[in-house]
Every structure is written in structure tokens, then in C-alpha cells.
Amino acid sequence: MLDQRRHQRIRFSVPQKISIGYGGEIGEGVIENLSLSGLMMRTPMPLEISRNVGCEFSVFDSPLIDVPAAVVSRVCDLFGVRFQQGPISQILIDDAISAALASGKASILSVHEMGGRKTMRITGGLCGILRSDFMHALTRMGVDEIDLEGVTAVEQAGLALCLVAANRHRVTIGAQSPCFAEAWAQALTAPGPLEKLVTGT
């Protein structure tokens, strides 16, 4: 589990706050996405690449995670940091990610290719926060099938994305978790209004 998620980006249904220690000051930010190896965050603090920062955050109801990190990228107020963690903080981060995915409060979207076919796999919450990544995979990368076996919670905005994929892009809806299968069956009875959440038409 640890190795599989080391570089997978986890997005949250509700933005998670983070406290940042830098240059003797404490500032605030918001986590954009999280992996075992680091995170992306937005903050007004003037962080500099290659400098060290202290990161303190919790993921929903997780214990407080306090980990040092190095700033590795910046685009405007969006910073990427790589954790300099020990085994305890790594376990805390993995446990927090696992709990958030199981509850549907966090999501992973990944694309895998096998035998010339591309499969989009969604784990955790099928929600509107995935729209940008979902549509990029659908329209830029080309997807043949969507694997939803790992979905633990479903939002209407997420169902709308799947309807657009199936009806307008002829993508196959593959493996399904019980909660997705139930919501999908209901969505298929009246797909029009849901699709409008994505297309506006």
C-alpha cells in the first residue's frame, strides 16, 4: 500500500488547512493534493525553492501530522514540497490517507494502459473535485474504460462525469463498487439533468 500510493495524488472533497513554519514565522495555507512523498499547497507566504519548511496538518479527523519538508516547486501561490519524514510520520500520513479514501472524503484518479487499452481508475469519493483531472484524461489522454470498483462515496457531480464519458465519449463503465452500482442504476433512469452539470447543455 505504501509504495503504491507514494506518488499518487490524493484530492479532498473539502480543502484541508495546513500550518507552515518558515524563516521563524508561522503561516497558513490550504492543501491542494497529498501523496506519501509530499504535497501541493496554496499559501501567500513567500516560500523559496530549496528552502526547508515545517508542515503541520491533519486530514479530516486524523491525528496531527508534523513533518519537515523541502520546497521543490512554485507556480504563483501554489507550492510543491517534498517530505523529509521518518517512519512514524509516514505511517500517520498513510493511515490518514487510507481513512479519508475509505470514507469517500478523498479521491485518487489514475490512468493505466494494458494491452493498448487505457483504463481510468477512481478510488475513494467520486466527486466534483475530480472534474479537471477527469476531463483531461477523457479528452486529452483518451480513455477506453473506467474502473470504479474502489469508489466508496458518490456525488451527483461525479455521476455526471461518468454519464458524459459513457454517453458522449463511448467509454465503457467497468468494475463497480456496490455504492456506485446503486447510484449509477438510478442515474441511468434520468441522465439528462445530471449531464447538464458537466456540459451545461
How would you name each of these model-derived features?
Residues M1-L34, I91-I108, H112-G116, C127:
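N-terminal helix initiation/capping motif
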Residues V14-I49, E56, V75-G80:
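Short strand-loop-strand
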Residues G29, I65-V72:
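Short beta-strand-centered aromatic/proline hotspots
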Residues R51-F57, I91-A102, D133-F134, T139-R140:
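Extended Gly/Ser/Thr-rich low-complexity repeat segments
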Residues F57-P63:
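Short, charged beta-turn/beta-strand-edge "cap" motif at the junction between a beta-strand
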Residues L78-H112, A185-Q186, L194-T201:
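C-terminal output/interaction extensions
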Residues M120-K196:
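Amphipathic alpha-helical interaction surfaces in cytosolic regulatory modules
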